[in-house]
Amino acid sequence: MSSGVREACESRKYNAIVLLGGGEPGFIESREIARPYGIAVTACGFSQMHFATMLGNRFSVIDLSEVHNMHYYDLVIKHRFENRCASIRNINYPLPRPPYSGESQVHLAKNKVMRGEFSEIMESAIHESVSAIEEDGAEVLILGCSALFWMKPILQKRLAELGLEIPVLEGYSSAITLAKAMVDLGVSSSGLTYPGPHDKKWRRKKLF
């Protein structure tokens, strides 16, 4: 990841870099690498959480497995949204990982839904979304794993049919839109948050 980001920065061909993965592997390192080049770096969870807090008071995450739930919990803490995150709701359809194999149940569900067929996974996502709203106080929903991002328009439509006018965000469009906004604003990352190894000025004290 870091070598690819460095190569992209050194090529001077890009104004921004978008990391497409719900779990944000290498995001902090990529921002640190890109900052001296003035290149914005965005990632899915980071972008969704920031947009979500502009749209409502609290958001909930619709996610697919225990292991990813806990990883996403760490992202919520890392990005300092623990006071704005109402809950992480788990539909419990893990992606196949070694030593397990076979086609993803989520991928099969997507094909079913696109054919207009019933999908238990889709219904689980709707059920957990309603619970997040009615029980947890969520006012915005975000999708945790990139394997679920295809659900956004269907989830939005089904919730609206239930009378729940709530924004649903997915990571790809959020990360790309934020990257464009940062380029338009002419900003990347703060040099005080991501300092270089030999910055000209240094701070004697940091307050958090």
Region locations from a protein language model:
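Metallocofactor- and cofactor-centric catalytic cores in central/energy metabolism, strongly enriched
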Residues: M1-A16, S131-G137, Q156-R158, E165, ...
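Glycine/small-residue-rich loop that forms an oxyanion/phosphate-binding "nest" at active or ligand-binding sites
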Residues: S2-F51
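Extended, charge-rich low-complexity interaction segments
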Residues: C9-E10, F118-I133, Y194-F208
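Periplasmic-binding protein-like
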Residues: S11-G21, A138-S146, L169
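Gly/Ser/Thr-rich loops at beta-strand to alpha-helix junctions
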Residues: L19-S30, L64-H68, G144-W150
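Short, acidic/small-residue loops that bind anionic groups at enzyme active sites
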Residues: R31-L55, K157-I176
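Short, glycine-/small-residue-rich phosphate/pyrophosphate-handling segment
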Residues: T53-Y93, K180-F208
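Active-site rim beta-loop-alpha module in soluble metabolic enzymes
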Residues: L75-G144
